[in-house]
Regions:
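Conserved sequence signature across two-component system core domains
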Residues: 3-4, 27, 45
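Active-site beta3 strand of CheY-like receiver
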Residues: 40-46
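Receiver (REC) domain active-site loop signature in two-component systems and cognate sites
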Residues: 51
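Helix N-cap/capping motif at the beta->alpha junctions
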Residues: 26-35, 56
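Alpha4 helix (beta4-alpha4-beta5 surface) of REC/receiver domains from two-component response regulators
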Residues: 14, 58, 81-103, 110, ...
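Two-component/phosphorelay signaling modules centered on CheY-like receiver
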Residues: 7-25
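Short amphipathic alpha-helix used as the core "switch/output" element in two-component signaling
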Residues: 35, 57-70
Length: 122
């Protein structure tokens, strides 16, 4: 599942993920994402941090706090921090959200597919 509020970004990432052989469901904010997960639990969620209605950290917190969805791997997408950074901001956000991983925007297609594959194989 992909949750992001930018329709152009969603379409681009959807094409990337589908090229890896994965089915992709889409939601455009955290609340819509929670509702979609309640209908059908995905194997993995790629979740943007900054969105209207409910941001990615709030959605991640709700998903990880629910026994029904706590085991679903979540990859946060952020335009704020680089993946390789050791900044306080990056680590604090990662720990507070309980997400399994994160990736900076703009995403690198090959890296995103590798990250998705690695979490689905665990």
């Amino acid at each position: 599942m992909l949750v992001d509020d930018d329709p152009d970004f969603v379409e681009a990432v959807k094409v990337i993920v589908e090229s890896g052989g994965y089915d992709v469901r889409v939601a455009y904010d955290g609340q819509e994402g929670l509702e979609a997960v309640a209908e059908e639990k995905p194997d993995l969620i790629v979740l943007d941090v900054m969105m209207p209605v409910m941001n990615g950290h709030e959605a991640c917190e709700k998903l990880k706090g629910d026994p029904e969805t706590s085991g679903i791997p979540i990859i946060l997408l952020t335009a704020v921090a680089e993946r390789v950074t050791t900044s306080t901001y990056s680590h604090r956000d990662m720990l507070e959200s309980e997400a399994e991983d994160y990736m900076p925007k703009p995403v690198e297609p090959v890296e995103l597919l590798e990250l998705i594959k690695s979490w689905l194989e665990k």
